[in-house]
Swiss-Prot record:
Heme binds at Y36, C56, C59, H60. Component of the cytochrome b6-f complex, which mediates electron transfer between photosystem II (PSII) and photosystem I (PSI), cyclic electron flow around PSI, and state transitions. It is a single-pass membrane protein. It comes from Sorghum bicolor (Sorghum). The gene is petA. HAMAP family: Cytb6_f_cytF. InterPro entries: Cyt-f_TM, Cyt_f, Cyt_f_lg_dom, Cyt_f_lg_dom_sf, Rudment_hybrid_motif. This is Cytochrome f. It is found in: Plastid, Chloroplast thylakoid membrane.
Amino acid sequence: MENRKTFSWLKEQMIRSISVSIMIYVITRTSISNAYPIFAQQGYENPREATGRIVCANCHLANKPVDIEVPQAVLPDTVFEAVLRIPYDMQLKQVLANGKKGGLNVGAVLILPEGFELAPPDRISPELKEKIGNLSFQSYRPNKKNILVIGPVPGKKYSEIVFPILSPDPATKKDVHFLKYPIYVGGNRGRGQIYPDGSKSNNTVYNATSTGIVKKILRKEKGGYEISIVDASDGRQVIDIIPPGPELLVSEGESIKLDQPLTSNPNVGGFGQGDAEIVLQDPLRVQGLLFFFASVILAQVFLVLKKKQFEKVQLYEMNF
């Protein structure tokens, strides 16, 4: 009887442990996969600082190019494409959080003018849906529908990101006017070098925190190193911790200086930002312009006809 109770108790404990492990895995995986947007959204009320710098550059230190393409002008209540290109060498591999090498992810933030927002699914054409693929965009804040974030997503598949945008209608939104507006964009490829709390990731170079001699280099079981540096002047010992990923550049017995690189820089990615302009065009102005062009063309036609008629009259008079 006691054996049965013991077995039942053990079985119950095992089920609880497995359930807790699964929950932790799901929560952890979700937080990692959503890391890029969450880092920016949690740390900053607005992703664009007063200086014009997009805050993603605070964590992604390398500067890389991006390209944004939008129509020159759009009509009110119209769906259009904003195409962001994040170019990089597809053969490159980045250092992952566990120190291993893997493909680069990309992410982006698109800052639209007030009133512009992500197009609803029922307004997106089949052709545009095909260009978008399986991307899932989200607003930076519930009250900031004009700021969109995406990522991290696989760079090999989404180095070109198509945003479906709905233009506002000044007839229904009184704070929107027919004007030229700026659009700002930021795009990254690869992991960042600094976390939002200021700590370093393993995707950056590690420097010596003291001048001295490398007394000992201990290779850790799960990867990475502990480097013991002894100051020759006072015998003070400092231990620098190197996470898995960066390659070591120093050896035991070597003299080093403060801030001297202890590792290579494994970062192959970077962040870039750009801007574009778009005109919210008044349909009446377009109609007026078309009417003007039509008037000019008709005037030219009538002028040609009148000239030919005059030439015929002259020719007729000359025959008499």
